[in-house]
A protein has these predicted regions:
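Positively charged
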Residues: 2-186
Length: 186
């Protein structure tokens, strides 16, 4: 992932120095690396995703493209709508598999087949979703503590613990894997 970030920076610097400009660079990057986001109310968003049986090069490529998409969308949306996206699930790009990417503890990581093992407390989460740009932020009651079993792209089983906004982010993305959107909460 660090290699991808360095590659992105090198391309950006080359584009700026070459006179192409940042707009040209971002447009080229979007065409080559950014996945299309499924538009609400596409029925695919309501399907329950199936687990990934094995983590192969195709899954790793998908996760990398999802991370590229998240990195592209985050600053664009921040400047357009004052929103900062921190997570993306495979169903949001039209793939009904249990894969999410999100920024946790300053690191963007891929999480395969997440399963919530424990929830505690409540947390008032201010939520927004790139699938629903016409909807406003909502305050959603989420868990203040979450323990999740999952796999990484190296196929090893992991256990993640998250509190506060990180727990809310994980819960939001796992909801997408189960066909649930934040607008479903009252």
């Amino acid at each position: 992932m660090l290699r991808d970030r360095r590659h992105f920076i090198k391309l950006a610097v080359a584009a700026l120095l070459g006179g192409a400009g940042i707009y040209s660079f971002l447009n080229n990057y979007r065409k080559n690396h950014v996945l299309d986001i499924v538009a609400y109310p596409d029925p695919a968003l309501r399907r329950v995703s199936t687990p990934l049986e094995r983590i192969d090069n195709g899954v790793i490529a998908l996760a990398t493209s999802m991370i590229d998409t998240l990195r592209y969308k985050a600053p664009v949306e921040f400047f357009l709508h004052a929103s900062l996206y921190k997570g993306l699930s495979a169903p949001q790009v039209g793939i009904a598999k249990r894969l999410i990417v999100c920024g946790l503890n300053g690191e963007t990581r891929a999480i395969v087949n997440p399963e919530i093992l424990e929830r505690r407390g409540t947390y008032d989460s201010q939520e927004y979703c790139m699938l629903l740009p016409c909807h406003r932020r909502r305050t959603i009651k989420r868990s203040s503590y979450l323990r999740v079993r999952c796999r990484g792209l190296d196929s090893r089983e992991n256990s993640l613990e998250a509190i506060g906004s990180a727990a809310a982010l994980l819960e939001h993305e796992i909801d997408h894997l189960n066909g649930v959107l934040y607008i479903d909460y009252t």
